[in-house]
Amino acid sequence: MLDLGRTFLQAVERDPARLAIVDGSLRLSYEEWATHIGALQQYFYSKGLARGDRILTVLQNRYEAATIHWACQMAGIAIVPLNWRSKPEEIDYCAQNADVKLAFVEQISLNNYLDSETGKKIEVILCGDIDGTANHKAFNELIKVGVDPIANGDVEDISVMLFTSGTTGKPKGVPRKQRAERAAGIAHVAQNQYAMGEVTLGVMPLYHTMGVRTLLSLCIVNGTYVAVPRWDVEKALDAIETEKVTHLYLVPTLYHDMLGSKKFHDDRVKSVRKLGFAGAPMNDALLLKLNKSFHPELFVNHYGSSEIYTYTINQNAVAKPGSAGKAGINARIRVIKLEQGPESSSSFMYAEPKEEGQIICDLAGDEAFEGYWKRPDADAKSLRNGWFLTGDTGYFDDSGELFVTGRVDDMIISGGENISPVEIESILSLHTAVSEVAVAGLKDDRLGQKVVAFIKTSSPVDASSLDEHCRSSDLVNFKRPREYIFVKEIPKSPVGKILRRMLVSGEYEKA
């Protein structure tokens, strides 16, 4: 198998003049970009970095972040990308846990980095429109003289270490080898039916599995990566229209924002022929609106994780809303009963069709990681009998398609019944007055937990109207919300996942 450095060189050799990356006014071909990557690779060596070392980035989606990523692959160095919003204590934990040797930041993340203990110990390079100082070099200084890159990495080298944003405790490092990354990139190309020269929007963060895969897969087909440093609907629409973007791969929240913008018009996105989403379930209403506005040739629901990139794929998401499809080309999946035997057991108890359980995935798959970084406690919880316990709940329908219903931790147990939030959210999303909805279980003396719907409205509506909407649907009565709370915003993570724990703890503002 080719390592990732050779994968990039393959793209340069195949079509050196093809436009590789766009970031504002910056436009580089594969041949031009390669010399920037090579110059940075040589800088790594000048600092004594070697295969197996790790470097830290606290950057938005910019040209520098993508260049650093590829330079690391060339050198066999692992990149440890963090959210640019990371606080000093988060930077310290991840940097110390990963034992990084060098860091890259930009203006927006500089103060938090310098306030961290890491900032006092590890050399930092300044990216973007920041001049170098006596103490800190500027990124642009490192690439003044272009150098051809050399693929010195290996498929067994760690390519990237993503830190998962756990709901409790410290984040877990997910080391992914170049072998698994290349397999995931090729799978992404195949499952999204990429053509040579595809153009996509580089807005999903490069500290997130979706963002990394977007970058890698574009190289495999000599595509163009149009960098959008942070989510801004108007800038995203401008980029789609100007650069004639052909494919979008976003979380549902960003699609929601796009359709809700006054600047959105079908004509502005007519170049987009393929849509994909991942990171969170998409409600039925948004799915149908997107299909009507874009008329995509392909509409992919991709279900996976940082640990194993692809679990399942549905290449026609509109045909059966809510279906995550069937196992991806490198995956095997099962649904096991929520209540299992002792952890020492060498077998699982499997759920029946239509029975909700926990989704698991075979760790022998080409896209899988091999265990968490320095976290045997996390391995013991999530790795069992050669399978990865995803922590997600779902079920197979009669045709063998997977429906993802939520997280094991999000399961509402009301009056002894297990209730998943996603089904209720999809039904409420179809009400014309509902802009966004999230469902959670709140403590109840009689039921244990009661189903509560948190609603952001697009037009006036009251609880009785929403309740009648649920009663007239096929939602069984015990799943019907017992309370409706109208909020100004639904709390979400930086990549658009609903933060139900904040709803449960009362961390929201009523409308």
Can you name each region flagged by the protein language model?
Residues 16-17, 131, 145-163, 170, ...:
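Conserved pre-ATP/AMP-binding loop-to-beta segment of ANL
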Residues 29-32, 159-183:
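Conserved AMP-binding A3 loop
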Residues 33-39, 174-195, 203, 207, ...:
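Conserved structural elements of the adenylate-forming
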Residues 65, 86, 103, 248, ...:
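AMP-binding/adenylate-forming catalytic core of the ANL superfamily
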Residues 108-155:
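ANL superfamily adenylate-forming
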Residues 182-199, 207-247, 261:
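Conserved AMP-binding/adenylation subdomain of ANL enzymes
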Residues 220, 245-249, 259-323, 328-332:
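Gly/Ser/Thr-rich phosphate-binding loop
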Residues 341-381, 419, 461:
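Conserved ATP/PPi-binding loop(s) of AMP-dependent carboxylate-activating enzymes
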